[in-house]
Structures are given as structure tokens and as C-alpha cells.
């Protein structure tokens, strides 16, 4: 019977055990959750969890630091809530799992904010002081947002990469990798952003489409006799012509110093209206069509035969400054997918070009590098001096046309590198930088950094497993790491370098420690204000302070050193058990942390890596302002509750994209209500139950109660297995099924009659309540990691003397004898009950009965089903929720069926069963015999249900 109907009956005469609970049906989450956040903080719940966990094995989830800039968005919410679920579930599994949140504080975005607010001419000391203040303000804002989501952690003592101790330890980490021999200085093309005025890390580069001019350019013959010999000809049939390159970067032509051919590709000498052209043989037809020329192949030769031939610069006739020749070098990276099969080489602006030219004997001083840090050519560059390279593109094309070197020019849309902060195009630009060498062997010998890092990946568990190959291929193919940046707000590469040679001071390691001590006292400002004479005396005449700062990925990438073993070493430990971030961090934090730990420790800094996907809308589209499909976690928390966000995240397979929309949130809210209603039923029916006073020993429970506890214990074993593997969506799916079907649709449905109509203190009712007590103990704990607000709210009603559900560990259910057989038997009974329910529904549709209690059923069953049904005796009717039930034996499954008949008896006013003995006691004409017994005598005897 439903509570509603029971409540509508006059209760005074024949009361039933309908109880209430202070746990309301409506969650009213937006109003209640902030009160819990406040209470958790005021009562020091995180500290109480730490005290309760002390001495247990440690489990360290190390927080990848978000950047201290801007409001938190849905991606932040996904990340922090997943971490919170992991930490809470590990604490409840019997670990000491602290959570120390952190923030990444140095770097370009904050420097840009300070420039926007105060201009670009601030003294360095003021930039630093304002950057610190800005980062602190942003952290406090984000902290409030994270706490509102129900994330528990050491919010009073987070780590910040700008804290003095962290800055100092980062300098010490730099000293470690220098000592081991991984760091070198060199000229090399690096990702360069003109707006940043600095080198960029690989992780700071994003790709988007850009339209540029694409050009085919001829470099005229400089050595016609040698060229003829290379093609096996006595002489060239005509003097005009040359070799043809294709490029999408016209601005690099002024800096050309070589041409690259593949040694094995066959090149053709083609006679055309524009002279003799050298093009890869397999590209001749396409190129002739593109150039609108007709051509005849005169001779062919493999690339190896053309090595070291020289050709005139294509602007040689336009200005004397370009009167130089370009040699042919061989390179395996040349392809014939597009273009001409010939690559022009400007070593200052391409990694492969640079490596090729250096390997052919070119020195750093030989390299032509006319592009300045702001994207303009040096003033002295012939024809184009002072122009920005992007403005120069069309002018270079016109100059080539005027010089007679241009064969074709058209617009070309291609995927091109952009700065992730400024969204502007970047280039490779050769600059003098500090690098960590991927293929460097440490001074002590052993494996290279690349080899060590790849071994570290092999030793790491990945969730999901595909992350391993992704990170492996990135490390296997990455270039040396550019450690240096040309900024102010960052940890300094606190070296003294020789003014003439650029060499490090011989006491560099000792000096780094001296600087670290000063930074520990007063921050990186100590380096800015340091007079070199304080540390190196008269050597200051020969050595100067290095002005570079460390890549911010080195800041966060060394948190395993300056947090796990530095600022928070008392709480944390190395290596961490888990790093958990979005899939972009294979290029970012996972990557830089692996490299720094491989250099410092010769191993990965983590035992496991968990990767989650990004949020998309209901149609699978990325969230963007232009589409207007973004969802703000603050808005959802204030409208529906943070619990709904938590349940959405936990119920979604985070290994792929996480789809969210109003429709999805509506479904999640409905699922939440089902769980909440289950908890309300449990708490209401336990409100007059005191475990110490009323609990029934397990061997005296009714059979269905033993089944329910055995089933719940088995389910919990499955759930804990999922929690251990960080599989949260199966936990949610199974718990929702458990609440709606196993409990709501079966066990609690069957239990209502016993709970409401049995004598309040009868063994039958107390057996049910004892089982419900154990179920509630178990359920609240497995819900707590993701439904944290609701589990805590229910726990305070259930166990008011306890501080919090979060200091508990997963519940140890009482042992039920023969649990496996019992679960198997009741699976059969539930199967039969499903058939009975279907038959009752058909009878109701045909207007033969009203409620199921108006029915009497005969179940025709065979084999194990017959045995299971008959074992329940007269209690079978309670399981089927009918007023009477009988079992008829048949030979086999084919003859099994259910007969439904309407009862011919009166309905009991109290229990609503239709029974022959209604009115058997004249003074209670509307009461059945069992209700009379339950109210006025010793109560009915029930053994199974």
C-alpha cells in the first residue's frame, strides 16, 4: 500500500506503523548544499577525515594545478569532481587519501592581465607584486567555486607554484637536472609567438585553419655544366631555367640557404616555355597543369646524383643582397605528396631545415635569421626591412614575380600553428635557448632521457588503456624541450653566464643553491634585485645574470619535487598513486612531469594516469560562445544543485566526451529523485528502530531479509571493484537499478505490509528493520563519494551521533549462511513474480480486479521454481502482493502459467487484504484475523516474507 492512501484512512481506530523522517522528499539542493559546505568547513570535516585515516596505507592523488586566472568552467567541474570521487572512495576503502589542491601561478596569461590593467612600462618588481596579488585573488575566487561543488580538501593550505618555498625548490630541481647533465644551451628553431615575445612549449601550440599564399619558385642554374653531368648529359639543351620549390611561407624566401631533395626520389629535367625545370618525376604532370605549361622530360636522375649542386637565390636579380647560391642537401623527410618534391630550406625557421644545414657543416653564425622577436624583419634586410612577415608575404610574391622567378601563386587554406593564448599564428624561429636534451645520456651514464621516459610509461597503469600509446608516441617523437622563456613573471633560470662565451659559471650548482635560499625567504624577486657581486664578487666583471625564466610547464611539471617532496611532504609522498586530468594533458602536465621525474629520479612520478574527455553539448558539439551552448556549473548548481552535476559526471563514461544538455540534466534529476525516495523510505521505516535495542540476530531473520542483505553485500563487492578501477558510471548504473528495481520494485514493495501492519515490536517487523539498517549502512557509504551532499544529509538523520559519513569505511555486512544459494533461489522467485505481475496487470486491464490485493493467484510451476515457491508456504502471497497464492506442480516449463481470480472475500480496513476472516471478531467487523492478532494478540507468525 502507498503511504498516501494509508494516510488518508482514519488511523486512530486501527493504527498502522506509518512513520515519518526529517529527511524530506524534496532535496531543495540549491538551498541546502551551501549550508553543508559551510558546516563542513566550520566543523573541520576534512581534518576529521585525516585524523580517522591516520596510520592507514597512503593513497596519493596529486592535483594537477589549474591556472590561477578566470572563473571555473564546466571542464574544471568535471576534473575536480572526478578527483573528489576518487579521493573519497579511496578513503572509504581504508586508505589515508589526502587531497591537497594546487594552482599554477606564473606565466603569460597573468602577465598579460597586468599589462592590460597597468600598461607595459611597469618596473619588474611592480609586475611581480601585482602578479602575485592578481593570482591570489583568482585563487580565492576559484576556491569558492570548487568548494561549492562539494569537493573536500585542504583548502586552507593548498599548494601554489608562486609560494616562496615552491619557487625555491623549483630552482633546486633545475640544479638537479643541470648536475645530471641534461641541460644545454644552443641556437635552435623553437615555437615562437610574436605577441608573447617568447618561445612556447609544445603544449602551448594549437592548430587551426589559416589561408596563406602558396608559391612555386624557380632557383636559376648556377652550375649548368655540373647540372648537365648529374643528369648524364654532355650539356644542358638551353641555359635558362632552374630547380622549382613549393612553399606556403613566402616570408622565409629571403632567408633561404639551401635546397633539399630526397636521395631516392627520381627528378626530371623538363623542357618548358619557362626554360628547363627540375621537378620530381612523379609530380611533373600535376606541376605542368598548375603552371599552365607544356613540358617534355629531357633526362632523369635520382636525388643522390644532384647532391651539392648550387642554384641562384630567386631574388638575386632584384637586389645585390641576395646574390648568393643555395646548395642541394639530401633529406629523407622530403616527399612527393604535394609540391615539386624539392624543399627550400631556411634553417632559422624550420627544425628539419636547421638539422639538415647544421649536419652539412653550417655554423650558428652562418645561419641567416632576419626575423626579430616581434615578427618584423631587421631594418637591414634588402627589400623588406622593417616589415612584419605577414605584411611582407604579398610583397615577397611580387618581388619574385618581378625577378622572373615565380611560376605560380594562389591562396591555400591549411592547418597552421597558433598560440593557445593569443590565438595568433606563430612560427619556428631560431633563438639561443636552454634545452633539456631528449637523447642526452646523463653524466653518470645509463639511458637517455627519452629511453628513461618511455620505460616510465611502460611501468604506469593507464585509465583508459589507450592513453599509454598516445603518451608513448608523443615522447618517442618529441624534440628537445625548450626550458627557457623570455618573460618576467616566472621562476628564473638563475645562472651567471660568461659575457663573451655564454658558458655557465663554474660554481653554478653552488650558486643555484645560494639563490634558492634567498628565494625561499623572499620569492623570485630576490633574483631580480640581486647584485651579482653579492654571490660572485669580482667575477661579476666577466659574468652576467641570465634573464630567462623557466617554462611554466617546468613549474607544474616539477610539483612531484617541490610539492610531494617539498611544501607538502608531511601529507603527501612520491611517487603519487594517480594523476588525473583531461586528455590534453598527455601533451601537458602528464608529459612535463614525466620528463622532469625521469631526469631527477629515473622514473615516472606517478603509478597511474587517468584521462577524462571534454564536455560537449547534447549533439556532440564542443561548447563555444559562438554556438551559445555553454553550460555554467555555477548556474546549474544554483538552479538544480551541485549534486546533479556530480551525479551527471559520475554516471557518464568519462573516457570519451561528456555530453550535457538540459534534457540530459532532466534525466539525471529524475534518477536522483529515485535514489532520494529510496533513502527517504529507508530512513522513515527506521525512525523507531534502535540497533542496540531492537536488532534481531541474523539467524533469526525472515528469509527475504537474509536474501536482501546477502544480495546487497554481493552488489557492494561489485561496486568496490568498479571504484578500485575508477569506473564510476557502472557504480551509478548498478545503484540506480538497485534502488529502483531491487529495492523499490521488489524488496521494499514486499516489505511494506510487514513494516506497516505487523506489531510494532514484533520479530517480523524488527527483522525487516534490522535488514533495512544494514542496507542503509551499506548504501549511504557507496553513495557518498559521488552523492556527497545527499549521503551526508541522510547520514545525519540515520546516525546523528556520528560526525560525518566521510570518516566511515565501506560497510562490513553481516555474514549470511548459504548466501549464494539464497541469492540464486530468490532470483528464481523474482522471475516468477515478474510473470505474476504481468498476469495481474492483464487482469486489471480487463477490469477483472482492481489492486493486486484483490487477486488470488495459482502459480503453475515445475522443477526448481516449484520447490522455491512451495518453500515459502503461506508467505508466498506477501511476495506476490496478492491476498492468496497457491502453487500447482506441472511437468515442465512449457506448462507453466499463472491463473488470476478476483477474491470473493471482504477487504480488511487496515491491511487491505481480502480475507475470509474479515469480521470474524464481531466487535471489529472490518478487521481481518491477522490484523486482530497483530493489534490485540501475539501477532501473526511469518517465516519467509
Curated annotation (Swiss-Prot):
**Keyword Membrane: yes or no?**
no
- Motif 'HIGH' region per record, residues: 66-76
Residues annotated as binding ATP? 625
What is the primary gene name for this protein? ileS
On subunit structure and binding partners, the annotation says: Monomer.
The entry lists its GO molecular-function terms as: aminoacyl-tRNA deacylase activity; ATP binding; isoleucine-tRNA ligase activity; tRNA binding; zinc ion binding
Reported cofactor(s): Zn(2+)
Enumerate the SUPFAM superfamilies for this protein: Anticodon-binding domain of a subclass of class I aminoacyl-tRNA synthetases, Nucleotidylyl transferase, ValRS/IleRS/LeuRS editing domain
Grouped into one coarse class, the protein's main location is cytoplasm
The UniProt entry, under HAMAP family, shows: Ile_tRNA_synth_type1 (MF_02002)
Q: Which GO terms describe its biological process?
A: isoleucyl-tRNA aminoacylation
Q: Which residues bind L-isoleucyl-5'-AMP?
A: 581
Name by which UniProt lists this protein: Isoleucine--tRNA ligase
Q: Which organism is it from?
A: Burkholderia vietnamiensis (strain G4 / LMG 22486) (Burkholderia cepacia (strain R1808))
Q: Where is this motif: 'KMSKS' region?
A: 622-626
Domain statement? IleRS has two distinct active sites: one for aminoacylation and one for editing. The misactivated valine is translocated from the active site to the editing site, which sterically excludes the correctly activated isoleucine. The single editing site contains two valyl binding pockets, one specific for each substrate (Val-AMP or Val-tRNA(Ile)).
Q: Explain the purpose of this protein.
A: Catalyzes the attachment of isoleucine to tRNA(Ile). As IleRS can inadvertently accommodate and process structurally similar amino acids such as valine, to avoid such errors it has two additional distinct tRNA(Ile)-dependent editing activities. One activity is designated as 'pretransfer' editing and involves the hydrolysis of activated Val-AMP. The other activity is designated 'posttransfer' editing and involves deacylation of mischarged Val-tRNA(Ile).
Binding residue positions for Zn(2+): 908, 911, 928, 931
Its taxonomic path starts at: Bacteria, Pseudomonadati, Pseudomonadota, Betaproteobacteria, Burkholderiales
Protein keywords = Aminoacyl-tRNA synthetase, ATP-binding, Cytoplasm, Ligase, Metal-binding, Nucleotide-binding, Protein biosynthesis, Zinc
Q: Which reaction does it catalyse?
A: tRNA(Ile) + L-isoleucine + ATP = L-isoleucyl-tRNA(Ile) + AMP + diphosphate
